[in-house]
């Protein structure tokens, strides 16, 4: 199941994530790491339990959780772990995480991992962080603005803003472009970018 997370570009999500995101900055003002905590919905979490509970005890032990983390690390690599970062309009590539830690609590799969830029990236001008699935198969939600944070030295000199686009307004403003062909593009669409909650940092 996990290897098939973003199987197609459907117009509505099938997997739901309650997420927390933290931009950690180094003393020199560069991005140290992007910390992610993902809590999956109960339906998807149950399917993961069915797939990985080799012991048949209705839970996931350390070995099984390690297998879950490895599967996610491998399967989401081609999707950039749903992480999209731009610095003054230029994309910032992210390196593959060293590992993804998986846990299973109260019927929910929880993934914790950190990403680092492939090259040293300083917070200068406008840096935008978006966590979203371009295929629209998975919905990533940040319940409050405090779930997208900035820490480290840059937190004192930079301004942080969480942007939550209104889907209805986005549809109205882009009505001509949002055709059925647009949504059926297997490579994903710009619509996910238009409606995704994002963290904007001005330095």
What do these predicted ranges mean?
Residues 21, 29-40, 109-117:
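Short, well-ordered beta-strand segments enriched in hydrophobic/aromatic residues
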Residues 26-28, 88:
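Short acidic-glycine loop/turn motifs at beta-strand connectors
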Residues 88-203:
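Mature, soluble, non-transmembrane domains
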Residues 44-122:
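Structured domain cores in non-transmembrane regions
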Residues 10-17:
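Cleaved targeting-peptide boundary
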